[in-house]
């Protein structure tokens, strides 16, 4: 299986990169021209299919779930980011979503394709520490949670960019329709009736960001718990304050603070968006930065 053509796997990744590279300027043009980003969604959808084919081929080529080193996890993260983007755009087909989210999938597949050595891009057998059924459960859930948190944080960054001192209110319904329905007492009859009200672009972005981050936070929680169980089975300890574990906890605390500010303190708009952007930086440190140290139980299979 390891003799399957290496070029086909990398070519699929390169093709996805080209499509996302084409999609990005079109997305920004759609924002400036206020047009619907149908072409961008098509390009991102095809790129996602190419990434799916790449992961399936790599799985067949290596004989294990393709998430065991930095190249494979970056390709998986690019796949998860593009899928998350498509799901968010399905809820609200705005060019702003495409312009905010497309750079993440593009950046992941670009880093995997051009920044990593050929040795890391080649398929290899699993190291003994990763030969566990927990690999798929723990790592894939963590990576999907990163995708949701990254896309949600980029939407929060879009809120900051577009913020004009607008007072936002979190309204929980009809996202994607451009409005929501509110119960209002009519003065004549005294009865309650539902009235449709328009919500602003920033309110829609803020609400979508909140929902996407909430999903990512829940998945991150599951991923950390499953990792602790796996660590206890492999190393006899649920938590060892490994650099990766420590930064994963910091990431969890940042997004817990984000949700706390919204749910308990009633923050919307700019202030929680700033917290989400901090989370964006923390994920980058946790996912890439920690591995540059080359130490800890999670350092294998990332850099030579």
From Swiss-Prot:
Where does this one sit in the cell?
Cellular thylakoid membrane
Is Iron-sulfur among this UniProt entry's keywords?
Answer: no
Topology versus the membrane, per the UniProt entry? Multi-pass membrane protein
The yes or no answer to whether the keyword Membrane is present is yes
GO-annotated cellular components = plasma membrane-derived thylakoid membrane
Q: Which residues are the signal sequence here?
A: none
On the tree of life, the source organism's domain of life is Bacteria
Question: What keywords are annotated for this sequence in UniProt?
Answer: Cytochrome c-type biogenesis, Membrane, Thylakoid, Transmembrane, Transmembrane helix
Which parts of the chain span the membrane according to its record? 8-28, 37-57, 63-83, 96-116, 141-161, 212-232, 246-263, 275-295
Pfam families to which the protein is assigned, alphabetical: Cytochrom_C_asm
* Broad class of where this protein is predominantly found: membrane
GO BP annotations, alphabetical order: cytochrome complex assembly
Q: What GO molecular-function term can you cite, just one?
A: heme binding
**Subunit note:** May interact with ccs1.
Q: What function does this protein fulfil? A: Required during biogenesis of c-type cytochromes (cytochrome c6 and cytochrome f) at the step of heme attachment.
Family in the record: Belongs to the CcmF/CycK/Ccl1/NrfE/CcsA family.
State what protein this is by name: Cytochrome c biogenesis protein CcsA
């Amino acid at each position: 299986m390891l003799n399957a053509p290496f070029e086909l796997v990398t070519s699929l990744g390169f093709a996805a990169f080209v499509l996302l590279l084409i999609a990005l300027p079109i997305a920004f043009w759609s924002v400036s021209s206020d047009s619907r980003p149908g072409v961008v969604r098509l390009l991102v959808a095809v790129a996602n299919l190419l990434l799916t084919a790449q992961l399936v081929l790599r799985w067949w080529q290596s004989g294990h779930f393709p998430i065991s080193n930095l190249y494979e996890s970056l390709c998986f993260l690019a796949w998860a980011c593009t899928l998350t983007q498509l799901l968010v755009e399905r809820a609200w087909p705005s060019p702003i979503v495409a312009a905010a989210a497309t750079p993440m999938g593009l950046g992941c597949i670009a880093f995997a394709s051009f920044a990593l050595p050929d040795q890391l891009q080649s398929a290899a057998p699993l190291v003994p520490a990763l030969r566990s059924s927990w690999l798929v459960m723990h790592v894939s859930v963590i990576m999907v949670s990163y995708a949701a948190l990254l896309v949600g944080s980029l939407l929060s960054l879009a809120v900051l960019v577009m913020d004009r001192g607008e007072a936002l209110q979190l309204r929980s319904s009809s996202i994607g329709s451009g409005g929501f329905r509110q119960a209002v007492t009519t003065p004549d009859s005294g009865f309650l009736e539902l009235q449709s009200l328009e919500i602003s672009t920033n309110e829609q972005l803020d609400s979508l960001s909140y929902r996407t981050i909430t999903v990512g936070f829940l998945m991150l929680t599951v991923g950390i718990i499953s990792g602790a169980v796996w660590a206890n089975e492999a190393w006899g300890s649920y938590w060892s304050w490994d650099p990766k574990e420590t930064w994963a906890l910091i990431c969890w605390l940042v997004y817990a603070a984000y949700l706390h500010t919204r749910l308990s303190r009633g923050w919307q708009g700019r202030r929680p968006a700033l917290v989400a952007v901090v989370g964006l930086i923390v994920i980058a440190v946790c996912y890439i930065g920690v591995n540059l140290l080359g130490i800890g139980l999670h350092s294998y299979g990332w850099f030579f």
